[in-house]
Every structure is written in structure tokens, then in C-alpha cells.
């Protein structure tokens, strides 16, 4: 139901609308054009980004295929190269880790710079909105501006997400390019090493082939020389034995003849010869003279002739000169062969020495290779131990991550259940996040801020209903703060809300102009009189009060109180439309402690036009009644930080947010309680009534 509207305020508002109609239309058309241009730029940029991402994904896929192929080739050839490249891989890993740490530092610096820029942008926006609040504009224009700003922020958020995604892909592409470049360098080194090893193996094979050929030929020549040496040795032995035999025979004959000659001389000198012997000698001499008896020379000649005949039969040559020439030729040939055999034996000895030296070198090389292989195996064992340690650490961290993930999923499920039970408004969440069937990790703050907003709404409604039931303001304040009336506030650890939480709205007053002090007091007095006339005193609900430590809300009792409150006419909880524009505002009610020093009750209401109206009452304690526009809910989304609203009160600049009150706890024993709603447009502290109070 619409509240009373004075003629003076209506005339002033109509005059301001006529006066501001032209500039507002121009500004609105300019904003529409700017929005269209930004939409076209966003679409073009989105298409370009998606096309670039597709190209990069295709390139990444091709590079991964090439990497898999190279990895397969490297694994095939990794038997020898792996041992040689362990140290280089460790150095590369160290370098990559250092690069990763440096990149993380750079990313953090960029994030800090981005946050500083966002804060500066928000400060400028706050300054612009503060300057624009002095101009009284219609509610529709401001509502459209807020919607445009919210849409711009949503688009900026989406653009920021796409940009982050694009930056992540760029970083991954850079890492893959670096890894690919390292793999190419490693492949080139491996190919160079492979070519060198193949050349060395080829040279060794040629050397081994030449050595085997030379050793085979040397062995064959050695065997032939051995055979010839054996034959010559046997022949020399035979000739030596034959010459020794002939020499012995000749020596025996000579000695026999000498003995015989000496004996004959001795006999001849000693005695007279025997007549028979003399006769025999004479007869031998006569036979010799007659040629009947052959001498020793004749016998030797006959023997030589017999030997020549045998040689002629064996060789087929009867000429003694030719036999002598052939014999000399054979002797020369045998001597040449003997010299050749001696040379071959000396060369064979040198080759054997060289073979022995090469065998010793091969043994030493094998020993060094075995030593290097043992060292590599030890290094591999050490690296394997390090890898096992890292794997165990990663498994431990993965298990811990899984446990934390399960806890987080449970928390998300509980938050969703609490969100559904509290019947929170999810329209803003759908506008920001779209229709999703699941909750992301970064959306938890958004859901918690929405739940807390709903909780404060229910607490405020309950406190207002208790005030209607003539409950003291101190008890109503305790109920609004979620504390029990009978029990003193317990010292419990409060739940710390997110930093971007917007102050929860309380009583909703849908009005198109700010209410004055007299109008607000008249409305409250009418409500009290109507309740007294209706008679039946309302009993307080026996359900346990709501506390922040255990957020359990009795929705049935809240709905009953809401139905009872809706029956009362001229209620400040009812929504009304003004001049067909349907603009609404949300009021926030906070009550101070009755034990505090008496002071004025400040009832401030800010409409969509941003004009504050304050009132003064005579009740004890302090209270503040302040409403903010519904479009300021963007401050609690968790994506955009909004500036905190300020609230000026009597006795000094006492301003604090709802989140700071909750972080300090409600059981601190403070004598006064105040709440301010952080919005995207902080309320100005230069209102007329507040200046009057100050």
C-alpha cells in the first residue's frame, strides 16, 4: 500500500523530471550506443579468441603426436643414451623448476597489479557515483543505470574468465614449446652421438677385419714355414748323419791304414819278412802291375760312377754339370726360402706382441667401462630413490587432497541444503552464474553471502514482529542478533563471513520518495494503534532463536509472522509501487542495547534516487533504519569488490560493516550495535539531517 505523499514533494519531483528529461535521455542513448559497441567488440574478441584457441589446441595435438613419436624413438634408443643424459636431464629439471618459480612470482605480481587496478577502478566508480548522487534523477533512470552497470560487470567478469583461460592456454603453449625445443636439442645431440658411435664401430670393425685377415695370412705363412723348416731340418739331419757316418768310416780306415803302416814298418825293421808274405806281396804287386787287382782310387771312382748312375735314374739327367747346376739352384732357392721364413717369423713375433698389447688395452677398456657402468647404476639407484620419495610425497599429498576434497564436497552439499531450506533468492545467482546443476568451489562465498543475507532478513523480521508485540528494544535487538533473551550471550567463536559480503537487507519499503521523520513516526503509531484495537495479543514463537553459531531457521514461524504482518495496513514491510515505475528499496533495521547511553534514534531511509531522510525519536538507545537499492547486491557476489558503506551516528563517526561485527563476535559486551550495508554506491554522509545531527 502506498504511503501518503505530500503535494510539495510531488511538485518538486515533477519539476526535476521535466528539467532532467533531456540530459537523461541523451545520456541513456549514449549508454545504449556504448553498450552496443562494447557488445560488438566483445563478440569480435570472443570469436577471435575462440579461433585462436582452436588453432592452438590443434597445434598442441599435433605437437603431442610428434612428442609421442619422438618419445617412442627415444625409448627405443634409450639403452645407451639414457645413461649419458641423466645429468643433463637433472640440470634441465632444475632449470625448469627455477623457471616455474619465477613464472609464479611474475603471475603473483601481475595479479597484485590487477587487483590494484580493479581497486582504482572501483574508487573512480564510487567517486563518479558519489558526484552523480547530488543530481536528483528519476528512479527509472537510476535503475536502468544500475542494471547496465551490473550487466557491464557481468560481461567484464566473463571477459576476465575468458582472458584467464586464454592466458592459461598461452602459458601451457609456452611450456610445451620449451619442452619441444629441449626435446629437439636432445634429439640432435643423440643423433650426433649416434653418428660418432657408428663411425667408431665401423672403424673398429674394419680394424678387426684387417687384423683377422693379416693374422690368417700370417698363420698360413707360419704353417708353411714350419713345414719347410721341418723338411729342411730332417734333410740336414739325414745329410749330417750320412756325412758323420762316412767320416767315421774314413777315419776308421785311415787309422787302420796308419796302424797297419806302422806295424809293417816295425815288422820290416825288426825282423826279416816271411817268405810266404813276401811271396804274397810279390804276387799282389804283379797283379797290380798286370791290372788284375784294383786300387782304392779305382774303387772310389767306381763308387762315384755308381752314385752318378743312381742320381741319373732319380732325376732323369745323366749330365753331371747339369746335375751340379740344378743342385746349386735348389740350394739357392732353399737359402732364399730360409731367409723368407726367418723374416716371417720375426714379423709374426712383432704381430704377436701387437696383439698382446691390443688385448691388454681391450681388458683395460672393459674394466673402465665396467667401472663407469657401476657408477651409473649407483647414480640410477640414487635417482630412483629420489623418484620414489617424490612419488610417495605426491601420493601423500594426493590422499590429503582427496580427503580435503571430500570435506569440501560435504560442505558444499550442506550449504546447498541450507540454501534450499532457507528459501534464498537465487535469481541473482542465476543472473551471474547461469543455470547450473552443481556448485563450483569459487561460488561458495556467493552462496554463503546469500544465506547470510536471508538469515539477517529473517532475524530482522522476527525482531520487528517482536517490537510489534511490545517487546523491549533490548530483547528485540538480541533477537535480531540471533541471541536468546533468557540466556546471556555465550562467548563462541563467530563465523567470519566473506570480505565481499553485502550487508543484509531487512524491512522492504517500496517507495518512490524518501520518508520524513513525521511520516515514519505516524506510520509506526498507526501500526501500534491497529494492533491494540485488534485485541488478541500475539504470543512469541516458542521456537529457539536464531544464532550465527548454529544457523537453523524455523521457516514455518517466519512465514506465519510474515502473514500476520501482511494483514496490517500501512505496514512498512509491504511493497508498494510509486507512479507506475515499480521501483523498490530494501530497508535495514538495527537496534542498540537499552543499557547504552540514551540518545536519539536515527531512522534513515535512502530511496533509489539516493536522497537520505533522517528522523529523531525519544526512545532510549540508538537505532538506525537504512535501506539500500536491490541492485547493490553485486557487492556480495564474490567477483567484484565493492566499497563499504558509511554510516554517521551521534557522538562521533561510529561506522562499521556487518562483516566486521560478525568477525569480532556479538558477545563482546559493547554498549551499542550498528550495521551498515556495503553497496556498490556508498551512501553519502552529507545529508541534511545527518549534518544537523552532527
UniProtKB/Swiss-Prot annotation:
Residue list for modification Phosphoserine: 536, 542-543, 545
Region annotated Disordered, chain positions: 271-290, 531-550, 571-694
UniProt feature, compositional bias: Low complexity: 628-642, 673-687
Keywords noted in UniProt: Cell projection, Cilium, Coiled coil, Cytoplasm, Cytoskeleton, Phosphoprotein
Listed Polar residues bias regions: 655-672
UniProt GO cellular component terms: axoneme; cilium; outer dynein arm; outer dynein arm docking complex
UniProt GO BP: cilium movement; outer dynein arm assembly
InterPro entries the UniProt entry points to: ODA-DC/CCD (IPR051876), ODAD1_CC (IPR049258)
Record localization: Cytoplasm, Cytoskeleton, Cilium axoneme
Coiled coil start-end: 27-192, 222-259, 339-418
Quaternary data: Component of the outer dynein arm-docking complex along with ODAD2, ODAD3, ODAD4 and CLXN. Interacts with ODAD3. Interacts with ODAD4; this interaction may facilitate the recruitment and/or attachment of outer dynein arm docking complex proteins,including ODAD1, ODAD3, and ODAD4 to ciliary axonemes. Interacts with DNAH9. Interacts with MNS1. Interacts with PIERCE1 and PIERCE2; the interactions link the outer dynein arms docking complex (ODA-DC) to the internal microtubule inner proteins (MIP) in cilium axoneme.
Free-text function comment from the UniProt entry: Component of the outer dynein arm-docking complex that mediates outer dynein arms (ODA) binding onto the doublet microtubule. Involved in mediating assembly of both ODAs and their axonemal docking complex onto ciliary microtubules.
Stated family: Belongs to the ODA1/DCC2 family.
Protein name, as recorded: Outer dynein arm-docking complex subunit 1
Organism whose genome encodes this protein: Rattus norvegicus
Gene that encodes the chain: Odad1
